[in-house]
Amino acid sequence: MAKNKIAIIGAGHTGSTLAFIIAERALADVVLLEIPKNEKPARGKALDIKESGPILGFNGNVLGTSDYQDIAGADIVVITAGAARKPGMSRDDLIQINENVMAQVTEGIKKYAPESKIIVLTNPVDAMTYAVYKLSGFPKERVLGQSGILDTARYRTFVSEALNVAQTDVTGLVLGGHGDTMVPLLSTTMVGGVPLRELLAQDKIDAIVERTRKGGAEIVGLLGNGSAYYAPAAAIYEMAAAILNDERRLVPAITYLDGEYGFKDICLGVPTILGANGVEKVVEIELSDDEQQLRDSADAVEDVKSALKNK
């Protein structure tokens, strides 16, 4: 039986951390692809990961390269490549720069890994997922964006800190766009099976929700240079594992909507079942009154999407 293969486009902090997790957990062989001028660092990171194998007890194959031919046969392609917003750069400038990156990357994927599933991480991730979906021509179930698992993990972490309980005992879902309008579902938030509202006052819950929405910015502020990469890489790993192992996990993911939740022609974070085909199903759940903010979140994503050339 052939071993699974995951190609990661972009060998920065998130891409290389993801490569390490995949190799260490023996999920798949990894191709870490960079632009030609950054090929040597990609090769160095790949070699460094391989050299940790004898110590940690894994035998993964990790290749650093700048040649798209090396992604041939990949089961999953993860896109982490793209520019970060710099001082003086408008939102529309960033969107157009990264849309151009998505166009270049998607051409390589279409040529060398046409049967792959694509997971997008590049920001603004909802809009970039939409761009990749349109540019690739792939079926909608094979183009996903990562945000909900990460946002939910942050939410669960902050709840666990407030209650001084195990993070793994907190369950919940965060839907919508990846930003200030994301929607933590309070009706689904449980701590060891107990509803969160029975354990925390509303003002404390509101503070947790706000901190979750600013979770990425909090990390950026603490780091001083760069952004989060451990948790984002872990979130992508969870998605990739669910697909390659056909786990049929119910997790939040960005996917193209065609009527679900009343939305059309938009990529948005919603509950999905992930399995061998990618998004096996979008799960539509009843939202309480305070969760109707999903409409506001979709409007914010539409506003960002309006700056795309391919729409």
From Swiss-Prot:
NAD(+) binds at G10, A11, G12, H13, T14, G15, N98, L121, T122, N123. SUPFAM superfamilies: LDH C-terminal domain-like, NAD(P)-binding Rossmann-fold domains. GO terms for biological process: lactate metabolic process; tricarboxylic acid cycle. It is an enzyme of class 1 (oxidoreductase). It catalyses: (S)-malate + NAD(+) = oxaloacetate + NADH + H(+). The active site is at H178 (proton acceptor). The keyword NAD applies. Keywords: NAD, Oxidoreductase, Tricarboxylic acid cycle. Belongs to the LDH/MDH superfamily. MDH type 3 family. Catalyzes the reversible oxidation of malate to oxaloacetate. This is Malate dehydrogenase.
